[in-house]
């Protein structure tokens, strides 16, 4: 199996005829050639020319070049011009496209996104690229053809439910099964925050564009991917007990100042970490309305954290300390709105003929009727996830979220928090609900 190469220059060296001449003119000539070639690597023909001394006869260099790779002339390492991944240590059974997809599943070329790629044969390229079923998230609207109200077999036709009982009624309904912890409406959270709360460094969570548009965008979409957040912790203080991977997993990226971190989703900031502070707990304690926390951990976890006497006392003490940011009057008003009861939440948008309690009952009955059995456990004790239930973005976890209003259930919680459009229908969503299968 091939392996990915990390911490290498952004472009591998291009082979030149070695001339023992250190004059400025010669160096300038080489630099100009190198720059020209790098600028042309969006062309398959140029990429193919870099394989003149490719050492592996059994690995198709044409297919490598066809799918965005060029030869770095360092061992058997190749690099994709479009996603930047470097792959080396190829083995006999390795194939270009599967290995490329394995190490860089979000490559825009493999996902059929719009790029400046210039193929030699566009039809040949189309034949070897992963099919649309493996490329749902990044497919162009023009290449994605499906029925407007289509949904995967066995999943909940949420759009039909929403049309009948209204969006807020669905939000008020909570979780999808009676055995799971209830999930609240995911709304705009407004908090001053920190482990103690960060003064001046925190902006309340707001949705971009305005709430009138109905569409959700994380505050820092560039850090929606966990690996992007992890890269910000290079200068993280090493004496702190909280490790970068723990903070990144909990949705935080490092601001580069002291021990201050921010949540990519709600924009809240935490600082002054104590040795016993656990990132997820602090996130849930101070930023309880954060949609990322709700998706990943659930409302029951948030309520449990808030109920812990020690944490509750710490939060109360921190809020009373001078110099700590406190939510403004406007924030308090919005916070009150987010904690409205189900009856208040649905009073404006639901048809008068459907009472909130009735909507909840209808929703639960539909969910119970369409619930899918829990995946079986094999003899080794590990749970095998059927392929049809895999997240259609990462293909590594079971899908467990529903995008609203389209109702498509195709992504795991972590991936759902990193996109702004439904991966299936490519339409912006206004909300995401955690789904529990019994």
Curated annotation (Swiss-Prot):
InterPro entries: BIR_rpt, IAP, Znf_RING, Znf_RING/FYVE/PHD. This is Death-associated inhibitor of apoptosis 1. PROSITE patterns: BIR_REPEAT_1 (PS01282), BIR_REPEAT_2 (PS50143), ZF_RING_2 (PS50089). It comes from Drosophila melanogaster (Fruit fly). Residues 194-213, 322-346 are annotated as: Disordered. It catalyses: S-ubiquitinyl-[E2 ubiquitin-conjugating enzyme]-L-cysteine + [acceptor protein]-L-lysine = [E2 ubiquitin-conjugating enzyme]-L-cysteine + N(6)-ubiquitinyl-[acceptor protein]-L-lysine. Zn(2+) binds at residues 263, 266, 283, 290. Changing residue 162 to D: Destroys cleavage site. PANTHER family: DEATH-ASSOCIATED INHIBITOR OF APOPTOSIS 1, INHIBITOR OF APOPTOSIS.
């Amino acid at each position: 199996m091939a392996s990915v190469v990390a911490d290498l220059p952004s472009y591998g060296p291009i082979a030149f005829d070695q001339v023992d001449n250190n004059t400025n003119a010669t160096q300038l000539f080489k630099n100009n050639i190198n720059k020209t070639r790098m600028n042309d690597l969006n062309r398959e023909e140029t990429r193919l020319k870099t394989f003149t001394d490719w050492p592996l006869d059994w690995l198709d260099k044409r297919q490598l070049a066809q799918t965005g790779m060029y030869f770095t002339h360092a061992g058997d390492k190749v690099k994709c011009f479009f996603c930047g991944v470097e792959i080396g240590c190829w083995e006999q059974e390795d194939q270009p496209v599967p290995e490329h997809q394995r190490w860089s599943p979000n490559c825009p070329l493999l996902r059929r996104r719009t790029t400046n790629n210039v193929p030699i044969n566009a039809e040949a390229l189309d034949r070897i690229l992963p099919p649309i079923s493996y490329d749902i998230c990044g497919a162009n609207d023009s290449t994605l053809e499906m029925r407007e109200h289509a949904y995967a077999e066995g999943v909940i036709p949420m759009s039909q439910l929403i049309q009948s009982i209204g969006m807020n009624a669905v939000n008020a309904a909570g979780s999808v099964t009676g055995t799971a912890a209830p999930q609240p409406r995911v709304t705009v959270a407004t908090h001053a925050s920190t482990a103690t709360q960060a003064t001046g460094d925190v902006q309340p969570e707001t949705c971009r564009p305005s709430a009138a548009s109905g569409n959700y965008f994380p505050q820092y979409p560039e850090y929606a991917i966990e690996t992007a957040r992890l890269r910000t912790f290079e200068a993280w203080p090493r004496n702190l007990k909280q490790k970068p991977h723990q903070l990144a997993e909990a949705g935080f990226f490092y601001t580069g100042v002291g021990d201050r971190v921010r949540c990519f989703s709600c924009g809240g900031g935490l600082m002054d970490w104590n040795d016993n502070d656990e990132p997820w707990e602090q996130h849930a304690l101070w930023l309880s309305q954060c949609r990322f926390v709700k998706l990943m951990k659930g409302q029951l976890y948030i309520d449990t954290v808030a109920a812990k006497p020690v944490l509750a006392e710490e939060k109360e003490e921190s809020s009373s300390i001078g110099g700590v940011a406190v939510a403004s009057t406007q924030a308090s008003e919005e916070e009150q709105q987010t904690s409205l009861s189900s009856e208040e939440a649905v009073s404006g948008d639901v048809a008068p003929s459907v009472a909130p309690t009735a909507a909840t009952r209808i929703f639960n009955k539909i969910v119970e009727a369409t619930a899918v059995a829990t995946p079986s456990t094999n003899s080794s004790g590990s749970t095998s996830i059927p392929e049809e239930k895999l997240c259609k973005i990462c293909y590594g976890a079971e899908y467990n979220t529903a995008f609203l209003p389209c109702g498509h259930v195709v992504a795991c919680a972590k991936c759902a928090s990193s996109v702004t459009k439904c991966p299936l229908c490519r339409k912006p969503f206004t909300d995401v609900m955690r789904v529990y299968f019994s």
